[in-house]
């Protein structure tokens, strides 16, 4: 039995279907999923099927082909190309045999990069990220994390 109120965006069943929970509902229509939740599921299935764990994900392109319903989804991942320096994966999310999402991921071999002197900035590096203030999209300061209201998907 699927717990639709689990503290997760999706719950997988024994048949490999992903059942969205109430946390995955989008803001426009209660029958449809949020794009962020859908993107998270795509990233999850790509990571789980990863044939090249030594490579790093460097790009993820997601196409929402139609509205994604608040209903069980199936996922399929295919290896498009793999080698020692790169790997290309494709993912497809389906509902009732209709493709609702197509995605492609690129993984590359991590390598040390030396930045030449002429390409380095003349100004100092920014402060430690932990000391920087956090602002909203309009540039207004946000309260510290422990004083913030939880988002609607994490309430």
Question: Where on the chain are the PLM-derived regions?
Answer:
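Terminal targeting signals and extreme-terminal segments of soluble enzymes
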Residues: 1-155
């Amino acid at each position: 039995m699927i717990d639709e109120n689990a503290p997760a965006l999706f719950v997988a069943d024994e048949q490999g279907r992903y059942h969205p929970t109430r946390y995955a509902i989008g803001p426009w229509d209660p029958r449809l999923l949020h794009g962020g939740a859908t993107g998270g599921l795509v990233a999850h299935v790509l990571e789980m099927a990863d044939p090249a764990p030594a490579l790093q994900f460097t790009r993820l392109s997601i196409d929402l082909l139609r509205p994604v319903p608040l209903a069980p989804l199936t996922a399929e991942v295919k290896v498009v190309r793999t080698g020692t320096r790169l790997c290309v994966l494709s993912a497809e999310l389906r509902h009732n045999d209709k493709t609702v999402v197509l995605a492609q991921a690129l993984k590359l071999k991590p390598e040390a990069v030396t930045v030449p002197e002429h390409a380095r900035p003349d100004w100092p590096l920014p402060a430690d990220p932990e000391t920087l203030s956090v602002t909203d999209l309009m540039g207004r300061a946000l309260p510290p994390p422990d004083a913030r209201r939880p988002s609607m998907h994490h309430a």
